[in-house]
Structures are given as structure tokens and as C-alpha cells.
A protein has these predicted regions:
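An acidic/histidine-cluster motif and surrounding catalytic segment
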Residues: 2-94, 98-289
Length: 289
């Protein structure tokens, strides 16, 4: 299948306010001669109270989720519903913080014949599974140097192929948003017959842009990790773990800093560590001031 014939299958999720991201990803896709459709992402703060009552559960609204997370989940679910009602058999869905390389669509085009093969029964194929649980249990098929199989604990919805059958399964299981959509997909993978695949090598790259799910935060830690190009570690530290009343976010970095502060007060008694933690916590929370 040529890239021109894939245009109706390729969707990029992008918030209207994130014009810089759209410009960057448009340039990247044009460089690789890939046509796509833009999906105007659902902005969580704009969803109605009626939508929240019908589609977001109590724990999510009060303890686990923020508006960005709810909007992200709503955007993906809307595209899954659109796929089911379309004539297409699969969608290739990208969030706007990814980057293609010269081999991305060469490999994607070679994946497509496997989507209709009952031997593999693919529901969902993650194109950028980079978290620490993404190792595949065993190789089921190979394309060039890329080995494909079912991962142990995959996360991320930054880029993936989903079949119509897979979209039906996800929507049957995810009636209400309860947490990050990639965690919900992970639970479905564990407790159902949902066939989730990924590869041993990322097919697209995650950029080091600020997350649009959590609130933007400039800290010494984030500046240092950006300088080192530790993109996934930075994303992991800044992703919100839980949120109080959709606003006050607690992420991994905050928890680690609080633990460091406790350890320092009990054992190390180091003034530099103390003031470093205080400064980082201030930078993390100045958005609320």
C-alpha cells in the first residue's frame, strides 16, 4: 500500500493551541512525503459537566486525573469510534510529540499485511514503546531488523496502529475514563484477549517537548535531562500520577524529591541537598501561585 493510499488511515492528535507542535510535525511529515489528517484534540477544560458525569468516574475526577488526561483519553476514544464507523480497517494514530525517521513508514507499510492475517490477530501495535516494560516476551514475526511480539508491561499512546477489531474491544472495556488511557489499555491487555504488539526497536521517536497532559514545569532536573537527551526519563518524571480535584498534580519527580528531603533530614544533613530540593519543589509548584 502506498503512502498516498494511507492518507485516510493516518491521524495526528493536536490541540488547537499547540500550533508550534503542529508546525513541527507537519514539516517532519512533509519531509518524508507522508500525508495525514489532523484531529483537533479535545481540550479537557472545555468538556461539559454532562460529559464528565457520564464518561469520567468519581475516583478519576477527584483523585487521579487532571483535565489534560481526561481530554487525551476523550480524543483517543473519539478516534476509535470514528474508525469503527468508517470504511477503514485500521488507523495509524500519532500524538503531536513524535518524529518520523527515514525508515518509519517503510516499516509501517510492511506491517500492514500482517494486520489482516488471522495467524497474528493484531488488535493494537505500539510504534514507540520505550518504557522499561516494553521488552517483548518472544518474537512472533520479524521485518528487517525489527522484531515484533507481545510486550510485558507496555505504556504510551504516542504512536500506534489500531485495527477496527481492536477499537471495538477497547471501547467495550473502557466505558468510563478512570486513569491514563495507556494504563487502561495495559489493564485490558492483562485481563482480556486483547492482542497488543510492539517491536524491539522504536519505529518513531518521541520528542522532548513538554507534556500537554500535565502542567508545564521548568525545573533544574528537567533542564539537565533535556540537555542529556533523556527524553523518556523526563517524560516519566513529569507525567502526573494523581491529581487532587483535577488541578493539584503529584508526579514522580515530586515524590522522589520528598523522599530525598526525608532521607537528607534523617541521615545526610547536607545543606546543598536541602536547598536543591526546596528550590525544585518551588519551581514545580509556582504554577499554582
Amino acid at each position: 500500500m502506498s503512502n498516498d493510499n494511507l492518507e485516510n488511515n493516518i491521524w495526528i492528535i493536536n490541540l488547537d493551541k499547540s500550533k508550534d507542535r503542529m508546525d513541527k510535525i507537519k514539516k517532519n511529515f512533509e519531509e518524508h512525503k507522508i500525508k495525514f489528517n489532523r484531529f483537533s484534540a479535545i481540550y479537557g477544560k472545555n468538556v461539559s459537566d454532562e460529559y464528565m458525569d457520564k464518561n469520567v468516574n468519581f475516583i478519576c475526577k477527584n483523585f487521579l486525573c487532571n483535565y489534560g488526561l481526561i481530554g487525551c483519553a476523550a480524543s483517543h476514544k473519539t478516534l476509535w469510534k470514528q474508525l469503527i464507523n468508517s470504511k477503514e480497517n485500521f488507523y495509524i494514530i500519532f500524538e503531536d510529540d513524535i518524529e518520523l525517521n527515514e525508515k518509519s513508514f517503510e516499516i509501517i507499510n510492511k506491517i500492514i499485511p500482517y494486520l489482516n492475517n488471522e495467524e497474528y490477530d493484531i488488535d493494537y501495535l505500539n510504534l514507540n514503546c520505550v518504557n522499561y516494560g516494553c521488552g517483548i516476551q518472544k518474537t512472533i514475526f520479524s521485518i528487517d531488523e525489527y522484531k515484533f511480539g507481545k510486550p510485558y508491561m507496555p505504556l504510551s499512546t504516542s504512536s500506534y496502529i489500531i485495527t477496527k477489531k481492536g477499537a471495538n474491544k477497547l471501547l467495550n472495556y473502557i466505558s468510563n475514563t478512570s486513569y491514563h488511557v495507556d494504563f487502561e489499555i495495559l489493564f485490558i491487555k492483562f485481563f482480556s484477549n486483547f492482542n497488543y504488539y510492539t517491536s524491539n526497536i522504536s519505529i518513531v521517536k518521541l520528542t522532548n517537548d513538554e507534556t500537554t497532559i500535565g502542567m508545564p514545569r521548568k525545573t533544574l532536573t528537567s533542564i539537565f535531562l533535556k540537555y542529556l537527551n533523556y527524553d523518556y526519563l523526563l517524560w516519566t518524571l513529569n507525567a502526573p500520577l494523581f491529581t487532587i480535584k483535577l488541578f493539584y498534580e503529584i508526579n514522580v519527580l515530586i515524590i522522589l524529591l520528598l523522599l530525598l528531603l526525608l532521607l537528607n533530614n534523617k541521615y545526610l544533613h547536607n545543606g546543598i541537598i536541602f536547598w536543591f530540593v526546596i528550590l525544585e519543589l518551588f519551581l514545580l509548584h509556582r504554577i499554582y501561585l
